[in-house]
Structure formats: C-alpha cells, structure tokens
Amino acid sequence: MDIFTLSESSNLLIYINRTTPGSSNLKFQDLGPWYYRNQYDSTQPIQYNPLSFSKFDMPEISDIDGDGDLDILSYDQGNYTYRLFKDVRIEKGWNRDTFEFQIMDICFGYFNEGFDNSIALGECPYKDKLKPRHTGGASCFMYDSDADGDKELVISNIGFPRFTYLKNGKAQSKSYYDTMVAVDTIFPQNT
C-alpha cells in the first residue's frame, strides 16, 4: 500500500511501498511533491502546477475512470465544485510507480455545492467569480452504487450531520462527461 499525504505547504506527497514481500521492515520511497499538467485552458501554454489541497478536506483517491490507475477528485474551495485530476500513466505505458496527473474536469459532475451544503445540479460556476465563503472541511468518495459503469459521488461537509449523495447519469445518457442528475440530501436513508 502506498501513502498519499500533504506537505506543510499542502502539496501532495506520494510514498511508494518498497517493502520486500514477507519482510516485517516497512520501506517507502519518497517520490517528492507532485504537480499536475494544466492543459485545460487552451489559451495558455502548458504548465505544471503544484497538486495541492486544503488541509481540512479529504480528496477521493481511486480509479475513478476505470483505466487501472489512481485518479484524484478534490473539492475546489474557490469555486464550490469538484476537480478531477486524471493519472495518464496507463495511456502513456508507464509502470505502476510513476504518475502524471492532468486536470481533466474543473467542474466534475456539473454541479455546485453551496456554502450551506446545498447542491445545484446542472450549474458550474467556474467562470463566475464567487466570493470565498467556505473554509474547508469537505470530504468525498465515489462508488458505482447502481452497477452501471459510472461512479456516484457522496460528499460531506463539516457542520452538517448527513452526507449528500449525487447520482451520476453518464452511463444512461452515454455522455463523455460525468454529469450528476439527482441528489439525495438525506443519505443514507436508514440513519
């Protein structure tokens, strides 16, 4: 198992597990701080930016797109959206202990999460300038709850006692993009 953590400056650090099978001595290789390739804005030259997160939030680190490598979904506090950072090592034919993250979606699921824990489906405020209202405390995880091949999203925020479940309609609409089509603000129902 590898370790994903944050530096003091909130940049992503990755430690690859180099423990010999059967050994009781844990050994990790520090891969240093990570950057993502910012190619989303075609008007700007390609540049690499630090992959950083709020110390109060917990990103989802899993194979979100189903291609066999680890991707990262994180809350964007400035815009109240979730950002998808895709690892493209599989596409480049690289081995398992290398990563190249590219920002693939600046408004994952095409929804907005308000400072009051409200969800606005079909709204992506990325191009709008919003005043910061949220100081952190967000977490998220994804799973394919309906076994249709796309992953639904569950989010939570500090100060709110329940989770919010967002249904992904990508598979039903045969869309290229993940699009949240329904929201359940009392999730799970049995609590």
Regions from the PLM with identified roles:
Residues 1-7, 66-76, 147-157:
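Acidic/hydrophobic-patterned starts of short beta strands in beta-sheet-rich repeat architectures
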Residues 7-10, 77-78, 136, 158-161:
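Short loop/turn segments that connect beta-strands within the blades of beta-propeller domains
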Residues 11-16, 80-85, 161-166:
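Structural motif
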Residues 126-134, 143, 151-154, 158, ...:
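Long, internal scaffold/assembly segments composed of regular secondary structure
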